[in-house]
Amino acid sequence: MKNIIIAAIKEKKVISFTYSGFSRVVEPHIYGINDGLPQLLGHQIRGSSSSGVIPEWRRFNISAIQNLQILNELFPDRRSFSSGKHSHWDKQILIVE
């Protein structure tokens, strides 16, 4: 799974997966370690979420991601992070350029 996420970030490709029972379509931006757990920070652009707010920034625990696929859809560039709530990482492994 890690290799798929890294490839999607490097190629700026949109990914889809199931998380907490919801279908997500996400622009992956950061793969890293937060509180000792591998996580993905992405901008969810389609799908659904328990919060109901889309599009929105979301952190995902890698261990809870299911049915991960790289889509044949590119995203143009790194989006601006609207707040500092996603800024803490123990280690950032890869950031979209």
Across the structure, where does each feature detected by a protein language model lie?
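Core beta-strand-centered patch of the WYL/Sm-like small regulatory domain
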Residues: 1-97
